[in-house]
Amino acid sequence: MSSQKTTTGLPTLSKSMIWMINFGFLGVQTAFTLQSSQMSRIFQTIGADPNNLGWFFLLPPLAGLIVQPIIGTYSDRTWAPKLGGRRLPYLLLGTIVAVIVMILLPNSGSFGFGYGSLAALWFGAITVAFLDLSSNVAMQPFKMMVGDMVNDDQKSYAYGIQSFLSNTGAVLAAIFPFLFTFLGVANTAKKGVVPQSVVVAFYVGAALLVITSLFTMLKVKEYDPATYALYHGIEEADNQKGESWLTLLKHAPKAFWTVTLVQFFCWFAFQYLWTYSAGAIAQNVWHTTNATSAAYQAAGNWYGVLAAVQSIAAVVWSYVLAKVPNQYHKLGYGGSLLIGATGFASIFFVHNQYVLILSYALVGIAWAGMNTYPLTIVTNALTGKHMGTYLGLFNGSICLPQIVASLASFALFPMLGGSQVNMFLLAGIVMLLGALSVTTIKETYVK
């Protein structure tokens, strides 16, 4: 690390250090994407009614809404050097729990509960809840460490690399079921049981989570409280003061709220992508709504490929966005979301599985923008005081839209004819509103 300081006092880090700070995000995102891309398939396979899928998809955002501000608040006040420092102890805890749950979740249909039984669905729901909780505990430290350790000049690059690694993990997660099927692992199973191709994918994802998280924990040395206070220009005791979340929100910079508006539309749209993709593809391309059929499972595998395409596009685009100068952030952000809106809407019209590759690539461009710019803009506007708490609270801009979308689906889904395909046209319109909302953002930098 260099001792050269920027206007905020933080030193300029080597690119290798920025990569090391973010490396564990590869494994965390692999776990998260396996859950989000396969959850609809798993629950419909064990007998969940498609009309009730919204209830299961309430669990991830609820977990994030509750857990991430708590992790932010407590990690602001934590210093445990033997466990890594300030944020890393929480990464360790989240990783341990997530690995255990990743082994249990794909086996939801293998414990003899019975197809469509309340016990099977409750087991799956509780397992997902724990995976969500642990994933959020493991995910938040990476976002906070960039805010803690990276200066304004490098922050866009750092979050761009985080997005790059995040999407690389998503690529791996998305192709695992397809890859293992290609290698001869069974992609079908008896009624109510999740295929082995999905089970093995979760096992491999768990191993990757352990390896990458350990890499970050062993390679990164967080700033001790005195050094942190010096670099951020605050008093060492500032982060120990117990200001309420409401008080902090009242004093949040304007950029916090304008980015939150954009986030609402973006995450609302993506909630429907995760909830309805497998069913929409099965309906539009394979012409089936029978979740136990081989055709439906083939559609589920193809969604895995499309999710990989989405993530590959996001990998490439996030690396491009990492190079965009600060003065063009809004153009890159709004343009990415506009392209994504086109991709969402196109899924409604497409009946060819290969044309869907283009649709999901466009969606991936929006995903890259969503994972690069919001945290860059918000952390640039924040001082070092209560950094973790603010980022935990900002996670509400991700979680609340998903909760609203899931609850709204109980009215919107029947209103749109009970068609999972129709939900994508709605998602495209909502994403367009997100792109237009970027014009409300005015970037500020702490001096």
Question: Positions of the model-derived regions?
Answer:
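C-terminal transmembrane helical hairpin of 12-TM major facilitator-type secondary transporters
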Residues: 330-373
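C-terminal ends and interior cores of transmembrane alpha-helices
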Residues: 91-117, 339-351
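Helix-loop boundary and gating motifs at the non-cytosolic
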Residues: 5-63, 258, 262, 266-290
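A late C-terminal transmembrane helix in Major Facilitator Superfamily
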Residues: 384-416
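Intracellular loop-helix junctions on the cytosolic face of multi-pass helical membrane proteins
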Residues: 1-15, 109, 114-129, 137-138, ...
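Intracellular juxtamembrane helix-capping segments at the cytosolic ends
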Residues: 137-150, 369-383
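Helix-to-loop junctions at the C-terminal end of transmembrane segments
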Residues: 66-83, 316-329, 413
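Loop-to-transmembrane helix entry/capping segments in MFS-fold secondary transporters
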Residues: 50-51, 152-162, 382-394
